[in-house]
Regions:
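Juxtamembrane/transmembrane-helix boundary motifs in multi-pass membrane proteins
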Residues: 4, 87, 91-99, 129
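Transmembrane alpha-helical segments and their cytosolic interface motifs
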Residues: 93-122
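Helix-coil boundary and interhelical linker segments in multi-pass alpha-helical membrane proteins
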Residues: 123-133
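Conserved small/polar residues in nucleotide/adenosyl-binding loops
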Residues: 140-145
Length: 145
């Protein structure tokens, strides 16, 4: 396995992870986007090992539903484990164990803290007739989404 994951690979993973929900469905939720984001690095790790790549893709195409802004943390952990050649069951177990708590933390930070605070501040501006009132909250909502 011994691949060299570069900063460029990690940056590409980050950009691709922003499309996590592009193939959202109610059977596997974000699994398609999750696997698609990780695929270039998985190909680099498994190189000529078609069976290993196939097993990794199959595992990552299983159900996942987490917070889109914090998914990079989970992807980084899983890529690290893939790189070290960890057992498939260990990798799957970590993914299943962490995607729910990461979703809860992300929801608490973004939807239940950041956005209500921004909405409160910006509604004060808007109520005074300031046209700039809705812009920061709209931007924050779009960035958090």
């Amino acid at each position: 396995m011994g691949s060299e994951i570069s900063k460029k690979d990690i940056t590409r993973l980050g950009f691709r992870s922003s499309l996590l929900q592009a193939s959202f469905n109610y059977e596997r939720m974000q699994a398609g986007g999750f696997t698609w984001a990780m695929l270039p690095i998985l190909r680099k790790i498994y190189k000529d090992d078609k069976a290993g790549l196939s097993a990794a893709m199959k595992d990552h195409l299983e159900f996942i539903n987490t917070h889109p802004n914090l998914v990079g943390f989970l992807m980084g952990l899983l890529i690290s484990m893939e790189e070290k050649g960890e057992n498939r069951d260990t990798i799957k177990g970590l993914k299943v164990a962490l995607f729910g708590p990461i979703a809860g933390i992300g929801d608490a930070i973004f939807w239940f803290t950041l956005l209500p605070i921004m909405a409160g501040i910006c509604s004060s501006f808007a109520s005074q007739g300031n046209i700039l009132g809705p812009i920061p909250v709209s931007y924050t909502h779009l960035r958090a989404h």
